[in-house]
């Protein structure tokens, strides 16, 4: 079906426009007829092509390599549950079934992780490939597979690859997915066989998207060119430990044993992490380099999310003493980029009889292209994940000299390699990748990064600038790890001890792991490779020529924070600080999320259990949908006190009277407040930051958000300054900015509250005047976008979700985008709310990141657990399961989640038998 889009330009064409419109409609008609008729190029798009790529879900298929029959049972949403009698058969079948539904997604992903996108999409992807080759994810993955992964993990990866290749056998692109037919118009690309390393490489891409504070590190360095230390501190306030609780509030670090004890309620004391000085290259050269690097990072494709404040998640567990069932309930909803298909693939992997030959009985969310279950439950335990945000990357300034780099006064040779990038429809390109002892030189991959100014200022301790400094990256994922081992170990863990042992293998990305089991235990642990630094705290680039800034190792696993059965009876993780820095000796990061969501979840749980109340599965679901605006609670009382003579602005101001701060899709008050908040950020910070951090782009005349409101003389195009990609620098309006504004409100005459006059709109010299100006600007912004009549305003008209195919849905021909994309949907929720349908205040109100899935696991009866995905099981645009879960996701509904064989049988719609 075509997209259910309701967007309109709002432009009224004249005679010439009508002619163009007729031509456009004629072109669409011709293309549609080509699709139906299957003539000429339209043969690629014909109904037969579409049907050829849809998976067989009934009957039987013979697969060479199976040792016994495998049953694939799908429910009415196309979600598969696989039953086998050996581990190898189970994972081979997983590879086959995921390829049936999602191979195009898998293929694009492996080309991204290996820096080979140009082989599929041509010269437009060469720059991305150059950067990705420099990072070398596939090389690290290959080394990881060869040297660090266990024999059993390799066996499972091989079985999975065998299943994918069994699906590919005898098929060309158009038999696999509609997208290949589109690619066939422009190049002769053919899918190649899947390898075990393709699966391992996916973990590197995931780690990159969840890498932590690199953007903050760049931003702070850029700020030093214009702002003083106190101003930068204003924009990066300390974490509010006294107001927003960290994850771990019980237990202590034992200085004598060098271990953390999270099993009791005692409190510990120790010193905070070391903070060292940083490099002093503060002139135009460093600014140019870092701004260029920021642009490169912004342009890179993402694997699971956006680069920036949107990466987050909620996961919490409530112990049996506080639940209706008397057993734990565990909720999870990772916040990632809105993608089509969803990054998650729901699946069950069941051994008919659990034994040493067949060890798995697990269900949950998987990544297409990787065996095992990433988040979910087995017959004994359940677990969820949120991004920990710990700092696992550092940027180093490198002094280059000839064919080497300076290190402790000595010139060392680069480690170099030559990479060949093949380009569809064009000539191959060779690049040389250079590495220092710290890591690859990112500055080799962008022209801006090599424009090192001759006048760059450095302190007297730095080496002579010569031709300037390069930038290298030190990152934990550049070292071979064991995360793939961890996935399989988690999937079969039966208790807390086995869960903890499995988690120690989860090297990268570092995640907050939340745990519950059927024996009424709950827990939390922080695994991962987290560096210890000789000097520096990871907040700014440091001199690579001085070994005092080298990493000295990783925090010992036994010293990492955890909690087991805390006295309060629940654990909440939502990207807040893991532990109070004054109670822990190691530096985890300087850039936590600020705890807005986590504290709201904590308050919701506490309000429910105060006085002996009990929590149900549906209570957990309702908490996931909470869309209360915490920044509105802070600002609205101030806004209502402002005296505004303009009747139109007063009319909008009255929307805030009696507002309960919830951001429902139909709320006019939420629409107006969020516009005020966006304008506060623009006025207070937009003209005071270095130009490299300001919103990029020129002023544009953009269309109203949609035309679902009444047309009037104001509902025309509006001048919109500063549109930019959603994952660039501040001010994005996330909870860091909540904390910035909260603290600045204590000083209403701060220079941050000044803004110049603009046209007929007044300037401001204090907080109240700036708030007044923001209210005026917001009134006229929404008048232009939604119409003059505020009775027609709603948050959902501004805050809309579009789902776009990950490649051709953004850059393909218009007719292809029309076929592949879906939307819009009007959403409730907002930035830094529990229902985190995030938007970027610098770029508009559209939904950028979302709860990519939601689940609530019932440890009393797994068959009463609930789950939902953002889209559907299928990656095929004409499948009934392409977006069949999206409507329910939008409405906050969850689907039944069958686990027992009886429940699975009762919910089965189709059964496919894979035979040896």
Task: Locate predicted features.
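Gly/Pro-rich active-site capping loops and adjacent beta-alpha segments
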Residues: 89-121, 384-432, 549-594, 608
């Amino acid at each position: 079906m075509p997209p259910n889009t309701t967007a309109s330009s709002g432009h009224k064409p004249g005679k010439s426009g009508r002619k163009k419109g007729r031509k456009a409609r004629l072109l669409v008609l011709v293309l549609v007829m080509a699709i139906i008729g299957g003539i000429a190029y339209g043969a690629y798009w014909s109904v037969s092509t579409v049907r050829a790529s849809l998976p067989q879900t009934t009957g039987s298929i013979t697969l060479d390599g199976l040792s016994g029959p495998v049953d694939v049972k799908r429910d009415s949403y196309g979600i598969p549950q696989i039953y086998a009698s050996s581990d190898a058969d189970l994972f081979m079948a997983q590879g086959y079934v995921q390829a049936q539904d999602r191979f195009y997604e898998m293929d694009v992903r492996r080309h991204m992780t290996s820096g080979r996108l140009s082989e599929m999409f041509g010269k437009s992807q060469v720059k991305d490939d150059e950067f990705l080759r420099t990072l070398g994810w596939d090389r690290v993955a290959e080394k990881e597979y060869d040297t660090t992964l266990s024999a059993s993990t390799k066996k499972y990866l091989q079985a999975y690859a065998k299943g994918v290749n069994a699906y590919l056998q005898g098929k060309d692109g158009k038999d696999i997915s509609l997208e290949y037919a589109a690619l066939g118009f422009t190049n002769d690309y053919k899918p190649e066989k899947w390898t075990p390393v393709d699966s391992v490489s996916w973990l590197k891409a995931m780690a990159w998207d969840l890498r932590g504070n690199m953007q903050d590190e760049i931003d702070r360095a850029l700020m030093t060119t214009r702002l003083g230390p106190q101003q930068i501190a204003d924009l990066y306030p300390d974490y509010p430990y006294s107001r927003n609780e960290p994850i771990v509030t019980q237990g202590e670090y034992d200085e004598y044993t060098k271990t953390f004890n999270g099993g009791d309620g005692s409190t510990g004391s120790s010193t905070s992490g070391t903070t060292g000085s940083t490099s002093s290259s503060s002139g135009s050269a460093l600014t140019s380099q870092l701004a260029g690097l920021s642009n490169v990072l912004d342009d890179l494709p993402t694997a699971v999310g956006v680069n920036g404040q949107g990466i987050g998640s909620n996961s919490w567990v409530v112990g049996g003493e506080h639940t209706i069932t008397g057993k734990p309930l565990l909720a999870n909803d990772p916040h990632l980029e809105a993608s089509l298909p969803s990054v998650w693939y729901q699946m069950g992997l069941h051994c008919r009889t659990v034994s040493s030959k067949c060890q798995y009985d697990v269900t949950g969310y998987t990544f297409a292209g990787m065996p095992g279950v990433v988040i979910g439950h087995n017959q004994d335990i359940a677990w969820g994940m949120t991004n920990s945000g710990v700092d696992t990357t550092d940027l180093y300034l490198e002094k280059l000299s000839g064919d080497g780099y300076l290190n402790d006064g000595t010139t060392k040779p680069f480690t170099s390699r030559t990479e060949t990038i093949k380009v569809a429809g064009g000539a191959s390109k060779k690049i040389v990748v250079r590495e220092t002892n710290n890591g690859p030189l990112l500055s080799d991959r962008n022209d801006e990064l090599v424009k090192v100014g001759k006048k760059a200022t450095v302190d007297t301790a730095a080496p002579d600038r010569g031709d300037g400094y390069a930038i290298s990256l030190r990152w934990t994922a550049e070292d071979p790890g064991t995360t793939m081992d961890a996935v399989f170990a988690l999937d079969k863990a039966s208790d807390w001890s086995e869960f903890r042992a499995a988690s120690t293998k989860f090297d990268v990305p570092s995640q907050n792991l939340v745990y519950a089991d059927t024996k009424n235990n709950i827990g939390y642990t922080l695994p991962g490779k987290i560096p210890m630094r000789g000097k520096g705290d990871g907040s700014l680039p440091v001199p690579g020529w001085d070994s005092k800034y080298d990493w000295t190792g990783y925090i010992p696993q036994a010293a990492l924070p955890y909690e087991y059965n805390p006295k309060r009876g629940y654990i909440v993780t939502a990207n807040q600080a893991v532990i109070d820095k004054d109670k822990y000796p190691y530096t985890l990061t300087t850039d936590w999320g600020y705890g807005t969501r986590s504290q709201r979840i904590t308050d919701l749980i506490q309000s429910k259990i105060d006085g002996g109340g009990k929590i149900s599965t549906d209570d957990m679901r309702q908490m996931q949908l909470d869309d209360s605006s915490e920044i509105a609670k802070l600002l609205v009382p101030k806004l209502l006190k402002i005296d505004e003579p303009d009747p139109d602005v007063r009319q909008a101001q009255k929307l805030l009277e009696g507002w309960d701060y919830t951001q429902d899709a139909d709320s006019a008050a939420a629409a107006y407040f969020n516009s005020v908040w966006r304008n506060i950020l623009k006025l207070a910070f937009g003209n005071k930051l270095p130009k490299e951090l300001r919103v990029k782009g020129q002023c544009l005349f953009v269309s109203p958000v949609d035309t679902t409101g009444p047309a009037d003389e104001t509902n025309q195009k509006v001048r919109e300054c500063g549109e930019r990609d959603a994952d660039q620098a501040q001010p994005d309006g996330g909870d860091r900015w909540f904390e910035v504004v909260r603290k600045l409100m204590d000083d209403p005459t701060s220079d941050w509250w000044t803004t110049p006059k603009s046209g007929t709109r007044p300037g401001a010299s204090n907080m109240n005047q700036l708030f007044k100006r923001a209210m005026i600007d917001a009134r006229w912004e929404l008048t232009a976008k939604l119409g003059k009549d505020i009775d027609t305003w709603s948050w959902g008209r501004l805050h809309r979700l579009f789902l776009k195919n990950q490649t051709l849905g953004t850059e393909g021909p218009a007719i292809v985008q029309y076929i592949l994309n879906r939307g819009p949907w009007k959403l409730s929720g907002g930035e830094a709310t529990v229902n985190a349908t995030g938007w970027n205040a610098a770029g508009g109100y559209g939904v950028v990141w979302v709860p990519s899935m939601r689940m609530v696991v019932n440890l009393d009866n797994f068959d009463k657990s609930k789950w939902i995905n953002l889209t559907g099981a299928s990656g095929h645009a004409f499948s009934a399961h392409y977006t069949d879960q999206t409507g329910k996701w939008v409405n906050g509904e969850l689907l039944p989640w069958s686990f027992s064989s009886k429940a699975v049988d009762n919910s089965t719609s189709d059964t496919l038998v894979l035979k040896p």
